[in-house]
Amino acid sequence: MTSSVIHQAVIDAYRVLDTGEPLDRETALRLAALPGDAVLDLASLAHKVRLRYAGEAASLHACSIMNAKSGECGENCRFCAQSRHNSASIDVYDLAGEDAVLRQAEEAVDSGIPHFGIVTSGYGYLKITPEFNRILGMIDMLHRELPGLNVCASLGVLGEETSAALAAHGIAHYNINIQVAPSRYSDLIADTHTVVERIATVRLLRKHRIPVCCGGILGVGESMTERLEMIFALSELDVSVIPLNVLVPIDGTPLEGHRTADIADIVKTFAICRLVHPRTIIKFAAGRETVMKDFQGLLMLSGANGFLTGGYLTTRGREIDADRELGRQLESFTEG
């Protein structure tokens, strides 16, 4: 390799492939500034790192979620259709019943999806409430009816007793995102709560040995440097899965009509995230179909090794069968 063929920053980053040690901040900043014609070299490196350090080469982490409680959220997240501060047109309903949850979980199992998440709108549960107890009952029911299914949850901010309860009921993963660089959370995401509360929840979950799924959203007005701040902040939180969403601007939210993120910058972000987190599951969530479109397969070759399938909270996703076929096609890029 010579710098006339491959950008020097990419060459320097090859030490991650050689050693398995996470990328340093200085090199990450240089990679963030790469010109477009060097992005595929970076993507290739990230894919090699993923194959060497992030589990079985052909294994993709696939999960499905259920919006078990929708709308009427008192938080003012700027991207979210479920906030009552926004005027998006969505279905609004209270916590679903066990039968509805079981039906949707069975669909995931029948489709070969091993991870199923119960998601609720709202700030969260600092204490055990009757509604939280109903969720615990759902978790127990899924373990009983669908043994082998990894039951996950995303219920917002937690307290000590609710974190401990989820651990006692065998939750497989818990999702709570820091969304953006912590320094920009209040102006880019929300100011009715703080990112500190979310980080505290991650630490409580880790205290109780619950694997954490924690990532962010790209394209809400952050710079590449601020994306790096988020990526390195995740390094300090010992998370097991990093979901990266790409903003899908929703009518009736403050980000309605917002310009979509640049495709090459998204690829760079995923690739750098892989180099900073060589052994972590990096999951591509929202934005695959609507923003990345024809390029979503490229992201799966740029360090990602997981995806959310079957639909999101308030927007449609890809059919599970289509994602299964995508995974099969990607296997040819894992053969060495």
UniProtKB/Swiss-Prot annotation:
Pfam families: BATS, Radical_SAM. Its cofactor is [4Fe-4S] cluster; [2Fe-2S] cluster. Pathway: Cofactor biosynthesis; biotin biosynthesis; biotin from 7,8-diaminononanoate: step 2/2. [2Fe-2S] cluster binds at residues 152, 213, 283. One of its GO terms (biological process) is biotin biosynthetic process. Binds 1 [4Fe-4S] cluster. The cluster is coordinated with 3 cysteines and an exchangeable S-adenosyl-L-methionine. Its EC number is 2.8.1.6. Keywords: 2Fe-2S, 4Fe-4S, Biotin biosynthesis, Iron, Iron-sulfur, Metal-binding, S-adenosyl-L-methionine, Transferase. The keyword Cytoplasm does not apply. SUPFAM superfamilies: Radical SAM enzymes (SSF102114). GO terms for molecular function: 2 iron, 2 sulfur cluster binding; 4 iron, 4 sulfur cluster binding; biotin synthase activity; iron ion binding. PROSITE patterns: RADICAL_SAM. Residues 55-288 form the Radical SAM core domain. It comes from the Bacteria. It catalyses: (4R,5S)-dethiobiotin + (sulfur carrier)-SH + 2 reduced [2Fe-2S]-[ferredoxin] + 2 S-adenosyl-L-methionine = (sulfur carrier)-H + biotin + 2 5'-deoxyadenosine + 2 L-methionine + 2 oxidized [2Fe-2S]-[ferredoxin]. [4Fe-4S] cluster binds at residues 73, 77, 80. SMART domains: BATS (SM00876), Elp3 (SM00729). HAMAP family: BioB. Homodimer. Catalyzes the conversion of dethiobiotin (DTB) to biotin by the insertion of a sulfur atom into dethiobiotin via a radical-based mechanism. Belongs to the radical SAM superfamily. Biotin synthase family. This is Biotin synthase. It comes from Chlorobium limicola (strain DSM 245 / NBRC 103803 / 6330).
